């Protein structure tokens, strides 16, 4: 095989993704103070290989937060029914994703999930990595066709439920009832 046809076993993008996925798993299991060596081991790369892609811990964590931002958006949009052109379709997808239909978001928002492990300043991390993130979400909700007060109430109630899932504070029955009520609020005609 000519040298120009050879491809590395792992290309740059795949290695970067493997490191970020490993960082998500390891930080979720062991907390934000986990060593870079532990993340590298989980990713199947050397620590110097990790450092090649992420020269500092801060660079790695910024990229990790960026991946979470992207994945959160993708998960919500995956739960928006493409055939639903009624007002509230995006908000319904958001409620479904945050209240149990997305295994990724359930783990992310759990009491021991990645957001909890990153600490109370995780929103500051989000803003530092992607200052446009809040505006992107706000635009999506504002364009959804529901009255503003209703869309914000449903959104923030869904976020509260998401944080309580899997704890003694939100039983399965309470989740079922609250989710049904939130979805019903997105079905009613705009006032």
Tell me what each language-model feature is.
Residues 1-14, 191:
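N-terminal intrinsically disordered/low-complexity leader segments
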Residues 75-112:
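Hydrophobic alpha-helical connector segments
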Residues 22-29, 75-78, 157-164:
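Solvent-exposed, amphipathic alpha-helical segments
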Residues 61-68, 75:
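Alpha-helical DNA-contacting segments of helix-turn-helix folds
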Residues 18, 89-93, 113, 152-157:
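Amphipathic alpha-helical interaction segments
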Residues 111-119:
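Amphipathic alpha-helical elements of HEAT/ARM-like alpha-solenoid repeat scaffolds that form extended
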Residues 18, 22, 26-59, 63:
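Helix-turn-helix
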Residues 105-108, 123-191:
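Hydrophobic/aromatic-rich alpha-helical bundle segments in the mid-to-C-terminal region
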């Amino acid at each position: 095989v000519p040298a120009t046809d050879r491809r590395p076993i792992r290309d740059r993008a795949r290695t970067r993704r493997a490191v970020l996925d490993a960082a998500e798993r390891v930080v979720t299991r062991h907390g934000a103070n986990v060593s870079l060596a532990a993340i590298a081991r989980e990713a199947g790369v050397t620590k110097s290989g990790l450092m090649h892609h992420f020269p500092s811990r801060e660079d790695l964590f910024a990229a990790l937060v960026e991946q979470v931002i992207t994945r959160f958006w993708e998960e919500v949009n995956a739960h928006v029914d493409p055939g639903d052109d009624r007002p509230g379709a995006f908000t319904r997808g958001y409620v479904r994703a945050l209240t149990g239909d997305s295994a990724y978001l359930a783990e992310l928002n759990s009491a021991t999930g990645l957001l909890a492990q990153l600490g109370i300043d995780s929103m500051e991390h989000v803003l530092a990595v992607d200052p446009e993130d809040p505006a992107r979400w706000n635009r999506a909700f504002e364009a959804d066709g529901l009255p503003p007060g209703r869309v914000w109430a449903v959104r923030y109630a869904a976020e509260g439920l998401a944080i309580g899932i899997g704890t003694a504070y939100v039983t399965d029955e309470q989740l079922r009832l609250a989710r049904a009520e939130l979805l019903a609020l997105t079905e009613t005609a705009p006032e």
